[in-house]
Amino acid sequence: MRKTIQTLSLMLALLFTTTLSFGQYSSSAIKQGVTETLKDTVSNLEEVVVTAKPYPQFKLVGEYKQPAWTLVRKFPSTRVYVMTPPNTIMYEKWFDIRTPRDGSPSEVRMRDEFAFGLGKRLELDLYMHTVYKENDLASSFGFRGFSWEIRYALADWGKIWGNPTLYFEHKLLQGKRMGIEPKILLGDRIGAKGIWGLNLILEADVAKERVDQNREWAYTASYGNIINDDLTLGVSHMFRYNDVKQTKELYVGPMLQYRFNGHGYLNVEHMPGLNQSAKLSRTIIIFGWRF
């Protein structure tokens, strides 16, 4: 595990160094929101000498009039709405560190994800999955498979309570195992600087026999407090139930997001397991970049 942490720390340090030199709010959706803010400020200069600065993270931007905070992944475990307005692209590198409770070596599941804004409240994500298995004698790194994901928001932001979004993911892992993962995504603002998200999840393999489907019913819930334009702190919770193995897993722990600029951001979420069926901990680290 020490080798894994040292490797991830070096990678994140390099990524941090490369992002500090870029400018603010480059996507077309964010530019639109900032342009409107500047116009409002100029038009009101003669009337107001000292005024409170608008809070950009909650500024409604883009074709769907969504708040700017939804244009990046605020919560590693919980998705909210669509992140990519029309004609925009995002990239994310994931490190999903799973530490078993029995003391065996950790497994680091990695994925490279590209998200595309298709318009009409649709988003398409493409993934490549790899895995690193730690072992003092023979650690290994290998290819796991591919998957794709489609999201559809039922309405523009704020038109329906919770901003419901339909999510479907199809996986092809180890070259032979197909899986599906439908979800319902919910999320919104709460209070002055609070945000929340809730996902209802079914994850299963495609198989004729129920025993081979390995179905898991789950939900994730997250709350975040936007401290400023760069920093968000919060907490996440996960529950998973496997209806074949009859196992339940409970997790809860802190999360944070730091935005380097309008392009890059870093998410860290650490959730210790709360019961014996759960892993000792699940830690997710994400580096994201908006083109």
Region roles according to the model:
Residues 25-291:
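Transmembrane beta-barrel domains of Gram-negative outer membranes and organellar outer membranes
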Residues 1-9:
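Bacterial N-terminal signal peptides that target proteins for export
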Residues 9-19:
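Bacterial N-terminal signal peptides
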